[in-house]
Amino acid sequence: MAECGASGSGSSGDSLDKSITLPPDEIFRNLENAKRFAIDIGGSLTKLAYYSTVQHKVAKVRSFDHSGKDTEREHEPPYEISVQEEITARLHFIKFENTYIEACLDFIKDHLVNTETKVIQATGGGAYKFKDLIEEKLRLKVDKEDVMTCLIKGCNFVLKNIPHEAFVYQKDSDPEFRFQTNHPHIFPYLLVNIGSGVSIVKVETEDRFEWVGGSSIGGGTFWGLGALLTKTKKFDELLHLASRGQHSNVDMLVRDVYGGAHQTLGLSGNLIASSFGKSATADQEFSKEDMAKSLLHMISNDIGQLACLHARLHSLDRVYFGGFFIRGHPVTMRTITYSINFFSKGEVQALFLRHEGYLGAIGAFLKGAEQDNPNQYSWGENYAGSSGLMSASPELGPAQRARSGTFDLLEMDRLERPLVDLPLLLDPPSYVPDTVDLTDDALARKYWLTCFEEALDGVVKRAVASQPDSVDAAERAEKFRQKYWNKLQTLRQQPFAYGTLTVRSLLDTREHCLNEFNFPDPYSKVKQRENGVALRCFPGVVRSLDALGWEERQLALVKGLLAGNVFDWGAKAVSAVLESDPYFGFEEAKRKLQERPWLVDSYSEWLQRLKGPPHKCALIFADNSGIDIILGVFPFVRELLLRGTEVILACNSGPALNDVTHSESLIVAERIAGMDPVVHSALQEERLLLVQTGSSSPCLDLSRLDKGLAALVRERGADLVVIEGMGRAVHTNYHAALRCESLKLAVIKNAWLAERLGGRLFSVIFKYEVPAE
């Protein structure tokens, strides 16, 4: 757990006692609300899973009741804000050494008060060994589940629900982890589980899989033979020896057999011709390190060739590896990857999983929860409560390898609605939301991590100011600061800890940490005030636009969209202006914009397209509240409606920064409809539809959108997608390829990013794209 790591706890008995006496929300979070349990007990590690309800605060908005009033007061806010308690579902997964199982069971027993179940699902070899202990301590009946079924269910679950779950290991890259984007169709695949032996399973669907092969030569062989050869009894110590060894001192290589003639055979002289081949004739003693390395290569090559043969036999090109033998150790992933690449000639991909250690526990939980049908929901990793993929490299010293202390944690929140791909993606399997991978780009990574760290004071200040009546707001805000700061330091050292590191993941982690400490919407009052001001300006803006000629109006509408996008409290350059100059408004923002030609300027092509037939239906992803949505987006929407184009306006399901939420957009649209007959009739006739995206992020992942939105896009035949804002159109989706026309527009409000793109602060991106025929 992160807190144990931060306080210097290790794996000694003393540190366990210290950990176990921490409050339950430090390790077994929300344990008092746990409803269902599952456990996976292996040879050395226990993985506990439980489902709990989580009570947290949410900001709700609703229109004022104006019944009985002749007129609304001029400066009355457009809606009222209330903070309410909401209950959501969360899955918790905890991994710890078997040494601590009894102490952990005692801790659970002492804090378990609301469980609804009388049964705990158990899998793994230890389910038999510890059955009586579990039943005695928890007073729950142990139902043993099939190990392989649990592994498959767990694997399917993480592949579907956790972006960047799978990765390839590349020895010579920096970093070594290359994460894969979520594939919408995960089947079929081969799962190779390397425990004591090896099991190879072909997985064809959610419920159809078969054991197709295996081997008695696996992790247990490495451990057993390694112990005989080196007198080292601990598995991790064996790997540590292997990481420092030189196998060519023990193995007979191709060049040792053929000399220089190996080149005529088309073979590398460094290939192993015979594992341990030199030990039969050499007189010298071999080092423990060299023998461990030779043994590791021998077993990994055997497993790799076996996996490759089965993959080819079943025409599969993806092989996922898991089990005790892997456990995130670079030395094992490196040898497995080399073996697969060699024997398949690069045609089969060796893939590893961030959370492979939890697969059995996840699967056992899913088996026990089948009546609740957990697979009908979408789930999301909660970065605030997860310890991430930490390096378990035996090359690291014990202090570095302590990782997050005695416990590793994973938390997943149940999302309100199922998430699916946008139907308009050109090629969903190849879609990558993020424009820059910060794990690859060291310069950008350093800049953005520093940028988010320097912004912490402002975020804390805003969080406290959003709850003036709360006596503990400052204390909670400081806890938020510490937790997010710790996450940033982890990412400096291990940028791959939560998958691919991006600006989006940094923003989302910050939102998760704010929610963790009950700051659900720090900008709610700012948005309320700015929406009120912008609504009062709306009639005048529309009158000015209507007075223009057609061509002049089109440019004015686009400039209005761009000027509205300036009002982004997440941008330091803008928030500084907004805080220092209360009179900075729509016209001032227009004057900030770059003059044409813009940094990216497809406006002429867009104008030419507008001279053609109207689009059938436009899908618009909105960005900020206030001037952006009201004076920028709605006049643009109104013009499309006048052209005969239906509009789907998609806004965030939940709050993030000052981005407009779906519930806020409903009230704003209602108020605008009261002032504008075009919008009023479009809402009445359902030519203007307001929907939620399913997201609570300042960025946009088009592969995880609300299922209802996707259905509406199909039903209405959307043929234009408009994405506005830096988060949605630059940090994400800048390179997204769609099957229809698209507009991506934003004002660059970060000087470093603007310079990197070849522009200056407040440069304009206006990117109109037409798909190839």
Curated annotation (Swiss-Prot):
Binding site for acetyl-CoA: 196, 199
Function: Phosphatase which shows a preference for 4'-phosphopantetheine and its oxidatively damaged forms (sulfonate or S-sulfonate), providing strong indirect evidence that the phosphatase activity pre-empts damage in the coenzyme A (CoA) pathway. Hydrolyzing excess 4'-phosphopantetheine could constitute a directed overflow mechanism to prevent its oxidation to the S-sulfonate, sulfonate, or other forms. Hydrolyzing 4'-phosphopantetheine sulfonate or S-sulfonate would forestall their conversion to inactive forms of CoA and acyl carrier protein.
Record-stated family: In the N-terminal section; belongs to the type II pantothenate kinase family. In the C-terminal section; belongs to the damage-control phosphatase family. Phosphopantetheine phosphatase II subfamily.
Cellular compartments per GO CC: cytosol; nucleus
Name under which the protein is recorded: 4'-phosphopantetheine phosphatase
Known outcome of mutating residue 211 to R: Does not induce acetyl-CoA production. Restores a moderate increase in acetyl-CoA production
Activation and inhibition: Activity is strongly promoted by Co(2+), Ni(2+), Mg(2+) and Mn(2+). Activity is inhibited by EDTA.
NCBIfam families: panK_eukar (TIGR00555)
Source organism of the structure: Homo sapiens (Human)
Motif mapping: Subfamily II EGMGR motif: 724-728
Gene3D superfamilies (alphabetical): 3.30.420.40, 3.30.420.510, AF1104-like (1.20.1700.10), Uncharacterised protein PF01937, DUF89, domain 3 (3.40.50.10880)
Subcellular compartments: Cytoplasm
Co-factor note (free text): Phosphatase activity is strongly promoted by several divalent cation ions but it is suggested s that Mn(2+) and possibly Ni(2+) represent biologically relevant metal ion cofactors for damage-control phosphatases.
Modified residues (Phosphoserine): 393, 404
Clinical disorder: Cataract 49: A form of cataract, an opacification of the crystalline lens of the eye that frequently results in visual impairment or blindness. Opacities vary in morphology, are often confined to a portion of the lens, and may be static or progressive. In general, the more posteriorly located and dense an opacity, the greater the impact on visual function. CTRCT49 is an autosomal dominant form characterized by congenital cataract located in the posterior region of the lens. Visual impairment has onset in early childhood.
Gene name, Swiss-Prot/TrEMBL: PANK4
